[in-house]
Amino acid sequence: MPKQQKKILITIDDGFESFYKEAWPYLKKNKIPFIIFISTKPVGKNGYMTWDQIKEIEKEDFVLIGHHSHTHDYLIDKTIEEFINDTEKASRIFLKNIGYVPSIYSYPFGECSKEMKDYITRNFDLSFGQHSGVIDVNKDKFELPRF
C-alpha cells in the first residue's frame, strides 16, 4: 500500500457483549483489523464478554487486545497510586486469562494526568486518548487521538 494512501484504525472499547454478538461476526468474516480495549473488572458480568469470548477473538491475527484499566473508573480523579494499582491489577488479570499483558493502553474516558501518562509511557508501547485528530509521525504515541 503506498505510503500516501490514507488508512483507518478501528478501536473498540469496553468489551460489551453486543460487540461480540453484532460486530464480531462481520469483522471476523471480512478479517477487518481492530483493537479492542478491555477493562478487566466487568468481564463476564451481565452485558460484557466472557474471557472465553475474548480468547476466541484474540487468537485471530488481525485482532489486538488493548488494556483499558481494571475498573474503568474516571481515573483522572484518582491519585496516581490508585491509578497504578488499578492498572497493575488489570495487568495481573490479563496475564492470568490470556497469558500476556497488552502493550497498548486506552485511558478510560480518554483523559490522563501528566503522572498517569508518565506511568503509561514507562509500561506500554503506546496509548490512546479520546480527542479528535489525525495520526501522523509527529503525534505523541502516548496520547494518540481517536473519535
Where are these regions (language model features)?
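Generic enzyme active-site microenvironment
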Residues: T11-I12, G66
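Short, acidic/turn-prone active-site loops that include or flank metal/cofactor-
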Residues: I38-V43, H131-I135
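Acidic (Asp/Glu)-rich catalytic clusters
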Residues: W24-I32, M49-H67, T121
